Amino acid sequence: MIEQQIRPWGVLDSDVLAALQSVGRETFVPPDYRHLAFADVEIPIGQAQTMMEPKLEARLLQALAPKTDENILEVGTGSGYMTALLSHAGANVTTVEIFPELISSAAEALAAASISNLSMEQGD
């Protein structure tokens, strides 16, 4: 994924590439769509929400350039994958999701990925 999809889109930051390498995207993809975990498509996650394409997630993470001493507010937890990438950077992440079903599945995936430097809230 990194060599064929991410680098060609100008994502070259070593911290971003390390995060993408370390955080298993497939953990955050619903079981029925795991075969598409690394495809350049939006993946439905329920509640009429989708995961972004991997290249867009990578470009967003590179543009944000999170630092270890930052506190980050993420509005819209979704699958939890971006939450995990932000947390991997060492930042303290607070994530808020309106849909209880999504916060529940994201919490499971984040726990499975051993991501702990975050707080999750359900709300609008």
Spans of features found by a protein language model:
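N-terminal auxiliary segments of SAM/dcSAM-dependent transferases
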Residues: 1-32
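Conserved alpha-helix/loop element of class I SAM-dependent methyltransferases that forms part
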Residues: 3, 7, 32, 37-40, ...
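Alpha-helix N-capping/helix-start residues
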Residues: 13-14, 54, 100
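Alpha-helix boundary/capping detector
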Residues: 27, 32, 46-47, 86-87, ...
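Short secondary-structure transition/capping segments
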Residues: 27, 41, 106-108
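Short hydrophobic/aromatic-rich motifs at helix boundaries and adjacent loops
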Residues: 29-34, 76-80
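Conserved nucleotide-cofactor-binding alpha/beta core module
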Residues: 65-124
